[in-house]
């Protein structure tokens, strides 16, 4: 059973009823895990097979970044690759577009992290690479890494069109991959879009859950104080 979870933002209690009451669950988290350690994932993994992509909040702090990218959990990040999970080929594109790197439809400032580092002063280099913030920025090379593959499902943190803040370049990636469904996080609403695209698009919002068909099993409203 494949489940898609949107934007946990550090809270995971809402997931337990779904992974404990169903057998053989693969849980795919669509970014913004916002952890301070891998402990939450370690506990949740007793009940399900966890996969994820990173979101913009996953490089807000060193601890958030290290929890998923500096531990054994980094092997479960689907960013930049296509992995077969329960018979479904799932392509992952984590992170967000940022103007300092690439804000489609504008031309990119840098093609890949190496290009960025070549033209950056030494004080901007972090641990031999791009700054912490840009560890969750999308480069053109991220899309190039998977666009010639084939997949059944594309998961991404950013939204495609027709979301008002979506990006056509994600639709183009979905078309190249030949997917039948795109699941995205980032935006905290729950939307199943009505489009003329040859694939479905589902926005899995704040602490919400859908099944593989995009049916909402849990819808949560973000009522946190701003």
Residue locations for each model-derived region?
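Binuclear metal-dependent phosphoesterase catalytic core
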Residues: 14, 83-86, 172-176, 181-226
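Active-site-proximal segments of metal-dependent phosphoesterases and phosphodiesterases across multiple
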Residues: 9, 13, 34, 136-178
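Metal-dependent catalytic neighborhoods of phosphoester/phosphodiester hydrolases
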Residues: 15-17, 33-48, 59-73, 166-168, ...
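Active-site-proximal loop/helix segment associated with metal-binding centers of metalloenzymes
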Residues: 88-158
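A basic- and aromatic-enriched beta-loop-alpha substructure that forms the phosphate/nucleotide-
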Residues: 49-109
């Amino acid at each position: 059973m494949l489940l898609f979870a949107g934007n946990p933002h550090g809270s995971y209690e809402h997931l337990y009823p779904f992974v404990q009451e169903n057998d053989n669950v693969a849980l795919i988290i669509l970014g913004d895990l916002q952890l301070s350690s891998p402990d939450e994932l370690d506990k949740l993994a007793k009940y399900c097979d966890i996969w994820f992509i990173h979101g913009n909040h996953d490089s807000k702090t060193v601890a958030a970044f290290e929890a998923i990218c500096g531990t054994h959990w980094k092997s479960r990040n689907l960013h930049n690759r296509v992995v077969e999970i329960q018979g479904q080929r799932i392509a992952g594109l984590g992170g967000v577009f940022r103007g300092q790197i690439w804000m489609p439809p504008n031309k990119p400032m840098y093609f890949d992290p190496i290009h960025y580092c070549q033209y950056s002063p030494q004080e901007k280099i972090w641990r031999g690479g791009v700054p912490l913030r840009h560890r969750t920025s999308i480069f053109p090379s991220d899309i190039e890494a998977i666009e010639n593959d084939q997949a059944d499902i594309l998961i991404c943190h950013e939204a495609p069109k027709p979301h008002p803040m979506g990006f056509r370049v994600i639709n183009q990636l979905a078309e190249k991959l030949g997917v039948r469904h795109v699941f995205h996080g980032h935006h905290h609403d729950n939307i199943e879009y009505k489009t003329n695209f040859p694939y479905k698009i589902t926005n899995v919002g704040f602490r919400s859950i859908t099944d593989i068909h995009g049916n909402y099993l849990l819808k949560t409203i973000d009522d946190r104080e701003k």
